[in-house]
From Swiss-Prot:
One of its GO terms (cellular component) is dendrite. This is Syntaxin-1A. The chain crosses the membrane at residues 269-289. It is found in: Cell membrane; Cell projection, Axon; Cell projection, Dendrite; Perikaryon. The keyword Transmembrane applies. It comes from Caenorhabditis briggsae.
Length: 293
């Protein structure tokens, strides 16, 4: 009687443990599903930023190729830059939340958890992609600054004001567009148009520098994170690639084994049939030619 009760208690405990394991697996599966939904959302946001960066490049070219001040295109450019800034800050915030969650779970579970490794790899991949896009955006802005600076230099030359590169840089950094008009006679329409273009390019540079400063801290934070993760990601990618090669090789070997096994099985069947036929023939021969059988 006691043994029966003990067995029943063990069975009940085993069922409870199985239920707990099932609930834990279900919870983990749901968490990972939500995690991958978040990953796809972030990836989509980064792709949108990348597309907007390409649009910014087009606006830059349109502004510089237009001999007159194109206010509409500039407003569209300003809006694009504002959209990129908002989206970049959101992406950075979401990546930071994932990073904090990973660190918390790593302290609780250890680094050997399979789901945790998957999350770390996804986070690293997203971070690297984000930094690539923002690096391209930063380069786009600095290139545009240099092109605006070159445009100012050419317009000053046209106006008869010779300025060296260092002096021009100081004039730009002063933030005062009036420094460009000193010593220039503006009694013709052409001269006025030249100065208007210089002031417009100078304003563009001021906006660019403000935008670059606003994104600088975020950019450096993400760049440092990616650099620290680079070795880990490369190692994971190496292991994944070699694991894939191993699996491919194992699949090929398995196929060969199945083929060999199938051929061997066919040979056994053929041999068995041949032996059976021989036995039947011998039996018939014995019955026919040996009396008493």
């Amino acid at each position: 009687m006691t043994k029966d009760r003990l067995a029943a208690l063990k069975a009940a405990q085993s069922e409870d443990e199985q239920d707990d394991d099932m609930h834990m697996e279900t919870g983990n599966a749901q968490y990972m599903e939500e995690f991958f939904e978040q990953v796809e959302e972030i990836r989509g946001s980064v792709d949108i930023i990348a597309n907007n960066v390409e649009e910014v490049k087009k606006k830059h070219s349109a502004i510089l190729s237009n001999p007159v001040n194109d206010q509409k295109t500039k407003e569209e450019l300003d809006e694009l830059m504002a959209v990129i800034k908002r989206a970049a800050n959101k992406v950075r915030g979401k990546l930071k939340l994932i990073e904090n969650a990973i660190e918390h779970d790593e302290n609780q579970q250890g680094a050997g958890n399979a789901d945790l490794r998957i999350r770390k790899t996804q986070h690293s991949t997203l971070s690297r992609r984000f930094v690539e896009v923002m690096t391209d955006y930063n380069k786009t802005q600095t290139d545009y600054r240099e092109r605006c600076k070159g445009r100012i230099q050419r317009q000053l030359d046209i106006a008869g004001k010779q300025v060296g590169d260092e002096d021009l840089e100081e004039m730009i950094e002063s933030g005062n567009p009036g420094v460009f008009t000193q010593g220039i006679i503006t009694d013709t329409q052409q001269a006025k148009q030249t100065l208007a273009d210089i002031e417009a390019r100078h304003n563009d540079i001021m906006k660019l520098e403000s935008s670059i400063r606003e994104l600088h801290d975020m950019f450096m934070d993400m760049a440092m994170l990616v650099e620290s993760q680079g070795e880990m990601v490369d190692r994971i990618e190496y292991n994944v690639e070699h694991a894939k090669e191993f699996v491919d090789r194992a699949v090929a070997d398995t196929k060969k084994a199945v083929q060999y096994q199938s051929k061997a099985r066919r040979k056994k069947i053929i041999i068995l049939i041949v032996v059976t036929v021989i036995i039947v023939i011998l039996s018939l021969w014995l019955i026919q030619y040996i009396p008493g059988i």
